Amino acid sequence: MSTLDFRFTKSEKNLNSTLIIIPMVLLFIGIYGGFMQTLFRAGIVQSDPFMGGEYYKGLTIHGVLNAIVFTTFFAVALGNAVIPWSLKMNLNSKVAWLSGILMLVGSVITALVMVAGEATVLYTFYPPLKAHPLFYIGLVLVVVGSWVAFFNWIPMYLRWRKENAGEKTPIAVVGMFTTFIVWFIATLSVAVEILVFLLPWSLGLVDEVNVMLARTLFWFFGHPLVYFWLLPAYVMYYAFLPKIAGGRLYSDMAARLVFMLFIVFSVPVGTHHQYMDPAIGSQWKFLHGVFTFAVAFPSLITAFTIAASLEYAGRKRGGTGLFGWIKKLPFFEKDSWFFSYLIAGLVIFIFGGISGIVNASYQMNTVVHNTAWIPGHFHLTVAGPVLLAFLGGSMYLIHQFMGKPVKMKGWTLSVPYIYTIGVFIFSWGMMRGGLIGMPRRTNTGASYANPESMLYQPDWMPFIDISVIGGSIMFLAIVIYIVAFFATVSARSEATLEAVTFPVTAPLHDEPANWLRNFKPYIYIAIVLIVLSYTPVILDVLESTTGGSLPYSPNSPVPLR
Amino acid sequence: MEKEDKDLEGFSPKGAVAFFLIMITVYVVMWFSLYFELIGRG
Amino acid sequence: MDKSEKLALNVSGLLLVVFLVAIVYASVAKEVDVPTCITDMEPFATDTLFQTGPDSYELQMVARMWAFQPGNITLPAGSTVDLYLTSQDIIHGFKITGKNLNLMAVPGAINYMSVTFEEPGVYDFACHEFCGAAHHTMAGKFTIVEEEAFEGETFGEGSL
């Protein structure tokens, strides 16, 4: 595959660098908050110099900046990178910058409102806790900005299809479009929640909001959101990892099947976050559970396909025996530093996957719902494979778009391994604590973990302390990364500036897979499943709830008006 | 590292199959340990 | 698709089917289920506890910032409690440690689950959904006493 005839413009390079560097600063603020939360929870600190003593404000900042802002920026930057490169077509620069500016302005507004303490509502912003209207407006701008980026790619894709009739769409493009198709469908729901209900209510234009309805609209968005996080990582696993490892993607058809299944099953699953909610019939909760199992299927296939691709690479490198090929993979080769970010994430995801299946398993959710098990679980998914792939990807994109040599390669390569040790310890503590009843989203340091409190729970202490150890190691790894990242950003440009390139190679098995070449039928099936699965849920909510709720501040049990 | 364009002859992912079956076994054990916790709580 | 891929596909499908069958079994045979839609109950704003049979009670619980009402319930061993839960302000969460009872308390809706306490002991519950500045102090407990030592069900304010 020759890419010599395609070059990114200066404007595209600058935009993509901006979309990586600014969110990296926000990510670090959020991660600092996360580290402080482990200390708060254990009662080690009651206040910190930057964020003060408000645990829940810090938790809101941690969730919003890390899970929504950083992830959305990276997904857009990756799309802005691999779609033009794969299709050999430049972006419409004006539209791309418009998208970037909308997202940047939105993020800054949201961040400032949170830091000012005007939006201590956590990243789920459930009413009737009310945030400042600018919090919702900032989030809307981030989402609209990401839509603009997506709309910028659609005509490129359609033109490419026309000019290359009969050719397979490159897998990275399929993956990025899958990501944003899922994102677009999901964000329609949260747009309705915010624009129709929360924003007018926050502004005082309407008095009351139906809390169950808002909550249901949130989770229509909230679960596909996790695939929006995961899918760009899958793009890197399928498109980049085989080549970085020194092999080939085992099966092109499996990759295409996986992406199409994500389009079909990502959305009609949200009610599995509401298993313990009132006002939704248990039969519909079960239906969403079945669909959630269906969306687990493509991830299981991914585990096999990636393992087979790595085995191919390991054997090419001279590995023998049933597992000898593993030892030959480039875990510690400085020039293949990107490998460590992808492989460590995959190992973490083995456990993120099964804990997620547990959460989705209908009445088994009773054991874990809203306990510390849940943050234990999702630090093995979004803060595991997703974070590591995005950090590796960010470093790679900066290296390519700014033409900078990757600095501190040895340290850069070690970050994922240090982080993996940390996150396993952290999540083990959280999950075990959750099983004996420790709640999530709770400043235990001020009550349950305080020996002087009447509520003291000595049984929880070992697990809280374990999460401090794990959290500290995770934070250390990220500090190393941030130093290496900014050392790279501020390094002198490479003498010979080569064209931007991505580690992509042809698959080993390349079947025609004609039935997997068009998004349309899968989007239609997805719409049918969404209508079937959500109509009864929404009807139940509307029929069995009474009255609306006035807005509340987190600081007072008396409504704000 | 061998040259990239030279494919392995008759490659079959035996190790990946073995890995996958081990992973599924681990999944079954982990899932059912939670399942019996649930049943036991009553 | 080659043989190994088909194997992976089939094993994945089988795994999920086995899990689903186990879930249905727990629901049908063991009657461990999730809360469902309650439509035959009038909204309530105050808490009550009353006996409905030899070993059964109905408890209507109200969650508010930052207490459960009642926060302290004493019952004899062997009691089955039909627990109705609502919120009078914002969203709260309610989970009894060591029992299969985990409910969201949402304003404008009534949640329901039944629970049986066979063994005497103290069963704590703590609010598990962020509900404002003092969320981490919102807790309570069931005290289950031996049937012989039982002197009438009580319920009251306070978390301890």
Tell what function each PLM region has.
Chain C
Residues 1-67, 150-160:
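Extracytoplasmic entry segments of secretory-pathway proteins
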Residues 43-90, 94, 111-119:
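Beta-strand cores of secreted/periplasmic/IMS beta-sandwich domains, seen most often
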Residues 75-77, 105-107, 134:
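A generic structural micro-feature
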Residues 92, 138-141:
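Extracytoplasmic/periplasmic beta-strand context in beta-sandwich domains
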Residues 95-120, 149-160:
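Extracytoplasmic beta-sandwich strand-turn segments characteristic of Greek-key/jelly-roll folds
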Residues 128-136:
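Short, exposed beta-strand-loop hairpins at the edges of beta-sheets
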Residues 142-146:
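Interdomain boundary/hinge segments at the C-termini of tandem beta-sandwich modules
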